[in-house]
Amino acid sequence: MGTVVSLIASELMGLVDELVVMDSLSTDGTAEAARKAGAQVHSVADVRPDLGVRPGKGEALWKSLFVTTADLLVFIDADLTEWGTHFVTGLLGPLLTDPSVKLVRGFYDRVLDSGNVPSLEGGRVTELVARPWLALHRPQLSRVVQPLAGEWAIRRSVFEELSVPVGYGVELSTLLDVHASFGLDAIAQVDLGRRAHRHQSLHDLAVMATELMSVGERRRLWTLASPTVGVEGSGGTLGTAVLRLPAADRTWKVLPIPVDERPAAIGVEGYFRAQGFED
């Protein structure tokens, strides 16, 4: 993360107004490295503690709305091992040049473990869960090359209006919700070249897949006239799925998986004060 931050800080600060790292109790020195490299580092638990804290990537992105003010938001995964600052400029480009674009999703050649071979295939969860679900329920989105790409950009005015899953479902939810509200032409894709990142175990991917299924099923049941059905108050929806995975000792590994969603930030008391306005 320190390398990512330092490159952005040295090459793009004429373009990037705020460089923020949301830290979810990391223990690998990520926060300190990012701070030394020039980023504003915020502990997720310390941002609006009155709203509580939930584990997950989506929680960090949702809370980033309370500590940033920029009109355009670019999200970059922290586990990248191969990337360039063109990720940022590439994702911002469509938003800066076309007012009708609301969401930009990156795609790239993923570096696979076997022989360092690049491929346009998505990860295992993309190919086995997300892409089949889209083919069945949102076929218009089947041409999105990597629907779960962790590198994407969005207009604040759009993201602050969306319900946000607290976990890994945030990429799928934004894709589905922007498509539902603005149509296919509001979504752009950018070829970012080549990307490498750390890979996860199958058990970790099972957790991700469960969260994605929750996001998809919830939105399948929503109507366009009422896109925030079930989002309650400033705490959002509450829910936990229980995933049981067979362990090596012939017992069950029981994993409670939060499938909460945070509500649209724009409706949360104090949000406008964070932007420098009165509620």
Predicted regions and their residues:
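Terminal low-complexity segments of carbohydrate-biosynthetic enzymes
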Residues: Q200-D279
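Conserved catalytic loops of nucleotide-sugar-dependent glycosyltransferases that act on lipid-linked
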Residues: P118-V215
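A conserved acidic beta->alpha catalytic loop
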Residues: D23-E32
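Active-site acidic Asp-centered loop
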Residues: S24, I76-D79
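Conserved donor nucleotide-binding strand/loop of the catalytic core
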Residues: D17, A31-E59
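Short aromatic/hydrophobic "clamp" motif used to bind/position activated sugar donors
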Residues: L73
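Acceptor/aglycone-binding surface of glycosyltransferases and processive sugar-polymer synthases
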Residues: P49-V53, K57, L61, W83-R156
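Short, acidic, metal-binding catalytic loop of nucleotide-sugar glycosyltransferases
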Residues: S6-V16
